[in-house]
């Protein structure tokens, strides 16, 4: 906070408008005004133009408490002394008043002119902003006024719960700031009919009372106050991940993040309430968690929608004992309709109803009573579940005819004949099906079960073919028991037939639903493309498509689809989502969600220094949440690195790359060999290198390296050290140094992840909790690791990168492609490598090295030189 009182005010200068193509010019019709004296018509014309050009809508995250441009009546402001500030009353083309105030006592000494606003309610906001638009005369353009003319004015505020507390003494007001103009106008500007309008914004907080007054003090300037806008900022209500986050007023501190819990949209649920964080600038940051649509509903445009009800039902043939109906598919099926459920009952007997299921849009209900009214309702079922029933439709069966009533004597004969026929038919069916009864679920029952209870045949077949998809089941997978509600990772390699694993965990997609647009990379087995996926009844989605190259072997196909078998078991917002596979046509494809920003390491390198610490922590939190999910399922990733994290346009990070098989060989580089090449050991825990012991704890070590990559914006871990040197240094206790400008809390978490004893490393759920605490308390991230402690944890020698490897400062700078700074270094006394080795980050800024990327490159090289100069540092 800035300011001279007990409460301060930050300030931000937004714009000043002056000459050039964008400069507003006074219309020719008003040119006559400018030949008038300074006071009166001249200012009136000038200010009228200014006001008309600045009636702009406020951004959606700003809520106005006062806008003098929109007040229709009297502002109620008070000026004293009365011959100081003067209100100029004009109207625009719609006859709405334009409120402007001017003062120009530049020829008189000791000016002290005050303009007081009426009481302004803060509406619960603890930090408010004041936007001023004004014009100011250049003192040099006023003959005879140089000794007394000023080019600034002062702004004050006073907090009060009293709406009528105008009796405030001058010394009770707290100064917000002295306001100066970016541009002032001269006599020449008046001749050219050019208006120069300044815009200044200041903020005040924290506020503790219900409202406040503003005051403007003139001390001898020639100024016109065109408009005053007072507002606070909020994070506007938004729906994110099927959760509604309400309007949230920002906090009092400019660095404060407010944690806000969201509520799930209708027909969606979650285990833990989703959260987002409202920044001081009115932006939603760091989304955590999401809601999921309930069974029977599907996500569409931020809502959970069920299949729309059947609305158009037509009656077909109606008889005394049956009614035939037909209907049209719902307007919004929200997916492929699998079947319809028809519920009907005799009117006024709703408790006794019958259900018919049909895959067609027509049915015939039989066995009804003559001359009776029946009520029908229909609903559709998709893969997401059932929709809502339609409204009730009533139809009446026909009465019994007279001829039929005279033939009642024939009914017993017909009934006996039908009964005998049914029994004979049941006996025949029983003998025919007795050998296959066990296959359909009757167990050891003999053929007699079919004879004695013909209905069992139907039930047996129904339970096999018509099993309710929502019924809870217990599955056995190659010796693994999968209980309802317990998600456990199942290794696809335990399946005798790998294709079974693919079909178990991945959805088959028709190739015709996929449109490939462009190639975005090359994978281990073929090209990686971006494209679109359009499934029937669903909206089109952008997707990434991995293809299997032509001429593949069966083993390559099995390995390629193995990743889909793994990925298909995961369902988490921070794990890459598998849309499905194409295996019944060529090319064989794996289809996943599309992540616009690609791999995290490349993205960070392209955007070096562009994110706040909170945004970086939000990325790390997402990765940790994804890894916690994998750890809870019993899955060990083994290859966690920034290159295997994908990031979308909302900066949400998702763990990917589940398809690599790893075999540790006797390699001089101590690398893991895979089908696609070698994975460097820089991300791998020491026990995994030495004993092939991969656990969630070894993933935690890798996560610490990912943290280092993120905070250093994609820098290569251990720089150009060889793998052998890295293994040796880590075994001896050396650890990576803190990245530049790294919060101490984050670096300490990295060191915790790099504990040699894997049992001493934090669990992923603990890491998520630690990062949540940092996000809720941003001030804890302000303490940075100092330069000396950064060097103390540096790794052992980096070969020939020390100061002795370069003969001059110029040669060193050229070697790291920073030769442009050679002359600056020499001019400031850094003429030897020994002198250069003592340079700090502050020195670089003082020398004019302002680009963050250049600072990092030079400091990294200097740190490496220091390592060689001390010839081995103290282990962690």
Curated annotation (Swiss-Prot):
Q: Where is the active site?
A: 639 (proton acceptor)
Cytoplasmic topological domain residue ranges: 434-876
How would you describe this protein's topology in the membrane? Single-pass type I membrane protein
Ranges for domain SAM come to 804-868
Q: Where, subcellularly, is it found?
A: Cell membrane; Cell projection, Axon; Cell projection, Dendrite
Q: What is the effect of changing residue 852 to P?
A: Strongly reduced binding affinity for SAMD5 SAM domain
Task: Give residues annotated as binding ATP.
Answer: 520-528, 546
Residue ranges annotated for the Fibronectin type-III domain, each copy included: 306-400
Q: Which InterPro entries match?
A: Eph_TM, Ephrin_rcpt_lig-bd_dom, Ephrin_rcpt_TKs, FN3_dom, FN3_sf, Galactose-bd-like_sf, Ig-like_fold, Kinase-like_dom_sf
Q: Name one Pfam family in it.
A: SAM_1
Task: Give GO BP annotations, semicolon-separated.
Answer: axon guidance; cellular response to follicle-stimulating hormone stimulus; cellular response to forskolin; ephrin receptor signaling pathway; hippocampus development; negative regulation of cell adhesion; positive regulation of CREB transcription factor activity; regulation of actin cytoskeleton organization
Any Gene Ontology CC annotation: adherens junction
What EC number(s) would the UniProt record show? 2.7.10.1
Q: Which GO terms describe its molecular function?
A: ATP binding; ephrin receptor activity; GPI-linked ephrin receptor activity
Span-the-membrane segments of this chain are 413-433
Q: Which residues form the signal peptide?
A: 1-26
- List residues modified as Phosphotyrosine: 489, 495, 672, 821
Upon changing residue 857 to A, the result is: Strongly reduced binding affinity for SAMD5 SAM domain
Record domain Eph LBD: where:
62-240
Task: For this UniProt record, give its keywords in alphabetical order, as a comma-separated list.
Answer: ATP-binding, Cell membrane, Cell projection, Glycoprotein, Kinase, Membrane, Neurogenesis, Nucleotide-binding, Phosphoprotein, Receptor, Signal, Transferase, Transmembrane, Transmembrane helix, Tyrosine-protein kinase
Q: Where is this region: Disordered?
A: 1-24
PANTHER family linked: EPH RECEPTOR A5, EPHRIN TYPE-A RECEPTOR 5
Relate the protein's function as given in its record: Receptor tyrosine kinase which binds promiscuously GPI-anchored ephrin-A family ligands residing on adjacent cells, leading to contact-dependent bidirectional signaling into neighboring cells. The signaling pathway downstream of the receptor is referred to as forward signaling while the signaling pathway downstream of the ephrin ligand is referred to as reverse signaling. Among GPI-anchored ephrin-A ligands, EFNA5 most probably constitutes the cognate/functional ligand for EPHA5.
Oligomeric form and interacting partners: Heterotetramer upon binding of the ligand. The heterotetramer is composed of an ephrin dimer and a receptor dimer. Oligomerization is probably required to induce biological responses. Interacts (via SAM domain) with SAMD5 (via SAM domain).
Q: What is this protein called?
A: Ephrin type-A receptor 5
Q: Which organism is it from?
A: Mus musculus (Mouse)
